[in-house]
Swiss-Prot record:
Residues 57-484 are lumenal. This is Falcipain-2a. The keyword Protease applies. One of its GO terms (cellular component) is food vacuole. Disulfide bonds join C282-C323, C316-C357, C342-C362, C411-C472. Optimum pH is 4.5-5.5 for host hemoglobin. Optimum pH is 5-6 for host globin. Optimum pH is 7-7.5 for host ankyrin. Optimum pH is 5-6.5 for synthetic substrates. It comes from Plasmodium falciparum (isolate 3D7). A motif (Bipartite vacuolar targeting signal 1) lies at residues 16-25.
Amino acid sequence: MDYNMDYAPHEVISQQGERFVDKYVDRKILKNKKSLLVIISLSVLSVVGFVLFYFTPNSRKSDLFKNSSVENNNDDYIINSLLKSPNGKKFIVSKIDEALSFYDSKKNDINKYNEGNNNNNADFKGLSLFKENTPSNNFIHNKDYFINFFDNKFLMNNAEHINQFYMFIKTNNKQYNSPNEMKERFQVFLQNAHKVNMHNNNKNSLYKKELNRFADLTYHEFKNKYLSLRSSKPLKNSKYLLDQMNYEEVIKKYKGNENFDHAAYDWRLHSGVTPVKDQKNCGSCWAFSSIGSVESQYAIRKNKLITLSEQELVDCSFKNYGCNGGLINNAFEDMIELGGICTDDDYPYVSDAPNLCNIDRCTEKYGIKNYLSVPDNKLKEALRFLGPISISVAVSDDFAFYKEGIFDGECGDQLNHAVMLVGFGMKEIVNPLTKKGEKHYYYIIKNSWGQQWGERGFINIETDESGLMRKCGLGTDAFIPLIE
């Protein structure tokens, strides 16, 4: 990757001098080293002032760590004030550009160092945040040494990331309890930013990443908090489950002798998918997956657009574990035994707040008669004729930072997340090597991480025309609720 500058370092100095010195002063004064020192000092002091304002814990600014979403916020004014000077911006950009050029020049040496040491337990294998090429600076061993918001060199090398982190805090209403916690989160943020940037510079990938609300979490933290699907066990004695032996009978009822196009079908275009929701800080993906497919059945079979209560399942599905995870099939089992589910208006979602089961909150409930296990080689057929499917998938940190495109990244090492399969499609993409168009098939997945994640809450995962390619174990567990 090449980082090009539109100007040379000496041009920055000249332009800054012309801005700060009166136009009537003799031109020889512009070359004086004292002027250069003043300019640099002003830039450094501005950035240091920004950091002092944001990262010094005191009584007036303690709200930053406990509540960063203050309505009457002067943060934008401070950021704009610091960045409105063309001289200050050019100076900082030149420093960042210089640092990035250094990073690229050292990349190969660092990779060789990593391979030679084969140290899989390092906190972070990557390039130093500083510019000295010393072994102690090639890796982050001591975050307190590297993350120093009062170090001018650190600020100059990371001004862009610091501003990016500030915007991340504000956009996602992040709350940190102390400056030390903020430093730790900033370190994780930098590591995730590095991964995202490296991926997005790979022209051979079919998808793009972005820093989202998970950017200050390690993958281990993210997995423990959001990937809560439990290992599935066959329900041999279930009186509600129609197993794969019953599949042909059910599909014949809805399909008949009709053939279908294996290239594309999207239930979102046929009023069969309700809006994307957000499970927030609760490991309740199993509830959102199962409730979502029930909502789709009522939309398709009854022409009713309803929003049902995931919270009732979280509170009352005793075969599952609330915010600590669960199983899709257990959700359907309990849904039937509860006699149906209230609407979200009657039983609203409160995420991880403690809530006792209260099945009497509503008089009208929406239930299912039974549910069907879908063979993993019949996903496209079942999706086309029966409707959206509640499925399992093995999620990784690549998946977590998905932005757009067809996901062809790394998968998790086990099934850990419940989502909905709502469609499939095909897109022709030009191969950057052959310069020829190639057909790429994908499944359309509805997630439960809000509409700000991915493609408005959805992700496209690569497959083949037949749908037999099931990346990330997609559809290993696959169930459709039946209301007729």
